[in-house]
């Protein structure tokens, strides 16, 4: 199975979700000057920012990570977290990234997710990778 790449703000909600998920994952650093580069296909897990609008929904660190053509080429899907208080903008970062990068928006969860979210994502990620061609 390929990996997960995620970003978590200082609130650590996404970090806690990843820890509970128990799957291999690499974190995009909070420090914008530090960068990572991935070497295999991955699913991105990202929080949504901005209080509900499209502008600012995707964290700057994630934009910078995806602006690296190598990283963007290996993206296979996106999972977004958000806050239901934002209404239609709940999980908007997932929609923005999926549309701009041409990958499926696989799932969204609120804040640090529920146990049901953990189970759904774990199962969904496993099934997603099983459906992918070996060299995709």
From Swiss-Prot:
Organism equals Shigella dysenteriae serotype 1 (strain Sd197)
- A GO term, aspect molecular function: FMN binding
Kindly give the InterPro entries that the UniProt entry links to this protein: Flavoprotein-like_sf (IPR029039), RNR_Ib_NrdI_bac (IPR020852), RNR_NrdI (IPR004465)
Query: What HAMAP family does the annotation carry?
Result: NrdI
Q: What does this protein do?
A: Probably involved in ribonucleotide reductase function.
Question: Taxonomic classification, please?
Answer: Bacteria, Pseudomonadati, Pseudomonadota, Gammaproteobacteria, Enterobacterales
NCBIfam families named in the record: nrdI
The similarity annotation says: Belongs to the NrdI family.
**SUPFAM superfamilies linked to this entry:** Flavoproteins
Any one GO biological process: protein modification process
Q: What is this protein called?
A: Protein NrdI
């Amino acid at each position: 199975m390929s990996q997960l790449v995620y970003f978590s703000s200082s609130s650590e909600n996404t970090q806690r979700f990843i820890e509970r998920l128990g799957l291999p994952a690499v974190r995009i650093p909070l420090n914008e000057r530090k960068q990572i580069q991935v070497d295999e296909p991955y699913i991105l897990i990202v929080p949504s920012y901005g209080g509900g609008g499209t502008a600012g929904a995707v964290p700057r660190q994630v934009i910078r990570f995806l602006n690296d053509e190598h990283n963007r080429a290996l993206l296979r899907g996106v999972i977004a977290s958000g806050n239901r208080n934002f209404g239609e903008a709940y999980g908007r970062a997932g929609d923005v990234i999926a549309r701009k990068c041409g990958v499926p928006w696989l799932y969204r969860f609120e804040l640090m997710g529920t146990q049901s979210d953990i189970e759904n994502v774990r199962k969904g990620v496993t099934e997603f990778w099983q459906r992918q061609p070996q060299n995709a």
